[in-house]
């Protein structure tokens, strides 16, 4: 019996690089050694990308996961007939593409909710195309949260052996600092610990990054560490969380990459993003925690400027599928 996890891959915005990186990734036999991938998309669009990606593959249009072959050389696609492929102009914002991209995701979510697939590995969508289609979301995370009735999903990056969580995300630095309260640090460490537990990570050693130079150096360069961050860490430790810090941001990610910590809690968006993407831009993969299913995602956009040219790297998509396959057997929904 084939026990490899079934990974659903929504095709993304048809006018972006989603279809071609999907084809390119599934042209790698090693992916089929660890996963059973099934695409949710439009078979004609994938077929159009075969010569672009120089892929000698067959497109198997299906209506249910049970019909999938899960064999290298064949791309199984749950074909949604929701797109006029002849009118798709690569690299442009189009309402039909935004609508189709949303419908691929919605279908994948339903499959996950029905336990037909073990995880989602998502490809890029475009905010402007969604808006043109009057789809009321700005991105995947908000969409998935609403479709699953999940409040405040938690984002984690993984690159090589390093995991990074984010205390704040899309805020100005000034506003992010205002959010760095001891209560928030405490709450997020509890949530991060639960997230890793759900992924099957047994040992969970956390480091919290510092905000100021040298983590403030006892108030010499700022009091945020003394007044908020350290007290928040201490509250988490009282609840049994294995956490240290604040550790100066110029060294904490280096130590995590070398195995001293199992995860870092980054305080603001760019602090963690820079660390991850300087380590390996293409292999930085996002995991959305807090959903009722496992979801991994490439951490790049639709790349309209190169879409349809066959030059987009497939490395991130490959890593996205591999990471979903890595964690899916251990993922706990409760």
Curated annotation (Swiss-Prot):
InterPro entries: PdxA_fam. A divalent metal cation binds at residues 170, 214, 269. Keywords: Carbohydrate metabolism, Metal-binding, NAD, Oxidoreductase. It catalyses: 4-O-phospho-D-threonate + NAD(+) = dihydroxyacetone phosphate + CO2 + NADH. Substrate binds at residues 140-141, 277, 295. It comes from the Bacteria. The keyword NAD applies. It is an enzyme of class 1 (oxidoreductase). SUPFAM superfamilies: Isocitrate/Isopropylmalate dehydrogenase-like. Binds 1 divalent metal cation per subunit. One of its GO terms (molecular function) is NAD binding. Its cofactor is a divalent metal cation. Its EC number is 1.1.1.408. Homodimer. Catalyzes the NAD-dependent oxidation and subsequent decarboxylation of D-threonate 4-phosphate to produce dihydroxyacetone phosphate (DHAP). Belongs to the PdxA family. PdxA2 subfamily. This is Putative D-threonate 4-phosphate dehydrogenase. It comes from Halalkalibacterium halodurans (strain ATCC BAA-125 / DSM 18197 / FERM 7344 / JCM 9153 / C-125) (Bacillus halodurans). The lineage of its organism: Bacteria, Bacillati, Bacillota, Bacilli, Bacillales.
């Amino acid at each position: 019996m084939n026990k490899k996890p079934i990974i659903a891959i929504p095709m993304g915005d048809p006018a972006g690089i989603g279809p071609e990186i999907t084809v390119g990734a599934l042209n790698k036999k090693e992916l089929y050694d660890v996963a059973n991938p099934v695409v949710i998309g439009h078979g004609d669009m994938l077929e159009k990308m075969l010569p672009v990606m120089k892929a000698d593959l067959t497109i198997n249009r299906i209506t249910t996961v049970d019909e999938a072959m899960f064999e290298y050389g064949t791309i199984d696609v749950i074909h949604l007939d929701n797109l006029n492929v002849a009118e798709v102009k690569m690299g442009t914002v189009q309402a039909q593409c935004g609508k189709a991209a949303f419908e691929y995701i919605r279908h994948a979510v339903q499959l996950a909710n029905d336990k037909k697939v073990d995880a989602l590995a998502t490809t890029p969508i475009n905010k402007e195309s969604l808006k043109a289609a009057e789809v009321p979301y700005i991105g995947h995370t908000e969409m998935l949260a609403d479709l699953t009735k999940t409040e405040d999903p938690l984002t984690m990056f993984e690159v090589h052996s390093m995991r990074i969580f984010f205390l704040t995300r899309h805020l100005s630095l000034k506003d992010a600092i205002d959010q760095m309260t001891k209560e928030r640090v405490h709450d997020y460490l509890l949530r991060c610990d639960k997230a890793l537990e759900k992924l099957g990570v047994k040992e969970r050693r956390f480091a919290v990054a510092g905000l100021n130079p040298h983590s403030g150096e006892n108030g010499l360069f700022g009091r945020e560490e003394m007044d908020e961050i350290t007290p928040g860490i201490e509250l988490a430790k009282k609840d049994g969380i294995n956490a240290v810090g604040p550790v100066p941001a110029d060294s904490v990610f280096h130590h995590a990459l070398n195995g001293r910590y199992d995860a870092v809690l980054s305080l603001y968006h760019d602090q963690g993003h820079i660390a991850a993407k300087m380590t390996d831009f293409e292999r930085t993969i996002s995991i959305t925690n807090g959903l009722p299913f496992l979801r991994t995602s490439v951490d790049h956009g639709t790349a309209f400027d190169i879409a349809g040219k066959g030059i987009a790297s497939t490395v991130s998509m490959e890593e996205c599928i591999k990471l979903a396959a890595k964690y899916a057997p251990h993922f706990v929904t409760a």
